[in-house]
Amino acid sequence: MAQHTVYFPDAFLTQMREAMPSTLSFDDFLAACQRPLRRSIRVNTLKTSVADFLQLTAPYGWTLTPIPWCEEGFWIERDNEDALPLGSTAEHLSGLFYIQEASSMLPVAALFADGNAPQRVMDVAAAPGSKTTQIAARMNNEGAILANEFSASRVKVLHANISRCGISNVALTHFDGRVFGAAVPEMFDAILLDAPCSGEGVVRKDPDALKNWSPESNQEIAATQRELIDSAFHALRPGGTLVYSTCTLNREENEAVCLWLKETYPDAVEFLPLGDLFPGANKALTEEGFLHVFPQIYDCEGFFVARLRKTQAIPALPTPKYKVGNFPFSPVKDREAGQIRQAAASVGLNWDENLRLWQRDKELWLFPVGIEALIGKVRFSRLGIKLAETHNKGYRWQHEAVIALASPDNVNAFELTPQEAEEWYRGRDVYPQAAPVADDVLVTFQHQPIGLAKRIGSRLKNSYPRELVRDGKLFTGNA
């Protein structure tokens, strides 16, 4: 594999020599950093099983190597890497897999270790959505996830990825993560804090990642991380699990942050060792039981993961003074909800008791029941999934609801050819050789729902959202 030239500040190299265990080779570290990163994907088990995915993609000649800590994760090699971007494959467009770096699958593996089955989870720094979607798959779309993102520009990307993967149990917020400890104390069974960091572990992906690196900036970042983990720990219920992770390598932003939390709340913090998380985990194990993953150990990005339990309650933070504002939605009455459910079922949309109908003007939404306890405590950017808009003749079903709720076995499902599916993703109407009978048509490809069309004569009118429309070469190879 070709090498690339990585910029290493001298002070960084000195710090790494001190931080690296004697069992590891510093020369191996430097060599690993200069090898391009292996690509990896995670199968979205909300949409397909690993076995079915492997069978579906077998004709492509992809080499898929299992990732030890994530049974649905694979390193991927393709002979035609330059011919078609992974993101333009049919399987990616329909949400069957997520392009995710292997080491970033570790925190969620740690969150659900030992059979942990949390019902209300927070992802404090969620964009672009790799870990939120991984959490949702582990929860099988049950319970509720609060996915927060501080950067306004990244919230849209977060929602797009959640929607593409067919996820229905997520509420999005846009806050500084330091507010949650005061705003929603002891409300979560599990919390993932994949903290903003100096990014020392990502040099294999970005050779210039350390251009602005300095020991002083590490200390400033660590100060913010301490505030974030303190807030997250307050938001965690007693008995709950907190996973703290970064994609950096210095101890200041990793072990020291976790040790600070234990020193601050000595009777409430229990470190949960990760040496048995997967075969070979002990190669990265620290004396505290954390995983400090240098890139040469597993040939992946540098990463850090710690898992801890909150053993008892801690003194509450001052109640926040901000006002959340009026919640603009109201629950739909049972009788009307039954009518809506029946109408939705006629086009193949079904949901279970984990979701409840709410209304805002002419909009119908499905919110995860587990998030209702947070209403009035935080302001949501987006909650659950938009099911439909009402109009004089009935309902205008929404694309994200189709992707999350539709069954491809519905009587009105219509399977597209590869060429027709590609036209669909380009936002164009489809003219099948034999048009379906129904007026509302659930269009599928590879037996996966990809949208809802109106039949007008022999034409299927495209309803694919404009912001998702794709240009350029797609999976049939035609531009």
Swiss-Prot record:
It is found in: Cytoplasm. SUPFAM superfamilies: S-adenosyl-L-methionine-dependent methyltransferases. InterPro entries: Methyltr_RsmF_N, MeTrfase_RsmB-F_NOP2_cat, MeTrfase_RsmB-F_NOP2_dom, Nol1_Nop2_Fmu_2, Nop2p, RCMT, rRNA_ssu_MeTfrase_F, RsmB/NOL1/NOP2-like_CS. The active site is at C247. Keywords: Cytoplasm, Methyltransferase, RNA-binding, rRNA processing, S-adenosyl-L-methionine, Transferase. GO terms for cellular component: cytoplasm. This is Ribosomal RNA small subunit methyltransferase F. The lineage of its organism: Bacteria, Pseudomonadati, Pseudomonadota, Gammaproteobacteria, Enterobacterales.
